Amino acid sequence: HYAFVFKTSLAHIIHRMCQEKHNVRFVKLSATLAGVNDVKEIVKIAKNEMNLSKRHTILFMDEIHRFNKLQQDIFLPHVESGVITLIGATTENPSFSLNAALLSRCRVFVLEKLSASDISTLLSKAITALNI
């Protein structure tokens, strides 16, 4: 049996929605591969785009729990100032894995695991919607 949460699918859906709105930039990072310097570079570009063209940046950070609580501090001033909108995805309990200051500035959405039946229903609806 496999359990699916579809975090990556959610990121793709958000990315597609951002592409439809030309004033929003979407960046996806994985905390398993990225570091604080990668976030700093994204923030630098986000500040420039915000100042020059009022283009907003959404940062999707997959596996955000892989950043330790000190590393997570990098997000705070930029989330507070509105330079970035942070979407953090994790399979861990955010109450334990996220910095309290960051967590207090977030809304937590719990994505429940989908059963095989749920996935089958979703795929059937997608096939119908796409006329496949």
Label for each model-derived stretch:
Residues 7-8, 36-38, 67-69, 94-100, ...:
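Switch/connector loops and helix/strand junctions flanking conserved nucleotide-binding motifs
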Residues 1-28, 44-47, 76-77, 81:
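Walker A/P-loop
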